[in-house]
Amino acid sequence: MASFARLWIRDSSAGVGTLTFYEPESRVFAGLGHAICDVDTGEEMPLLAGDIVDAHINGCYKGTKGAAGELCGVFGNRVMGSLAVNGNTGVYGVMNAGNAPSGKAIPVALRQEVKTGPAQIISTVDGKAPQYYDVEITKIYSGPDTQVKNMIVEVTDSALIEKTGGIVQGMSGSPIIQNGMLVGAVTHVFVNNPLQGYGIFAESMLHTAENVAATQEKQAS
């Protein structure tokens, strides 16, 4: 499992997002933790085709109360993989051979294993190197109507607060680690309080990734 900054492209627009996890056997990756939506209508965009490319984060507009911040990045030259699904739990696709991200494998937590309390997120907020930052999971929603906004995460890391003001656009997909397990991904920031945001259960993203892997295997056979 590894976290890297990526740029997600559609038609004539692009945005910075974060890779949440990668499964090396199938080469399937997952990111964002929410759908890519049309900037004008807010509707989930149908996906015809798309690529992910490496990105270098070269700046940040800090988040403040009432104004969400944003990571600023530039495109790399190498296409890392192709997108296959844009859905409410995130974006999914297949990494090109030879482009596997580095990192060690960790288990994915079941939703009942996620607890309130200390955790960490992995995010790239400058350069290309992902870093761990301290957060607190303050609330967990586990009902049937909470498919995406499953938890509230609060940034407690002074270094991250100094750099970004908290959670900013572009950090969507940042893995949430607790007790040595991948428990979720950051999805949204609270505009009225950039220290806080929503997260999605990693288990939900894994289910979609497994479906993508099964589809890819079927198409290859």
Segments and roles (model prediction):
Residues 1-221:
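C-terminal recognition in membrane/secretory proteostasis and scaffolding
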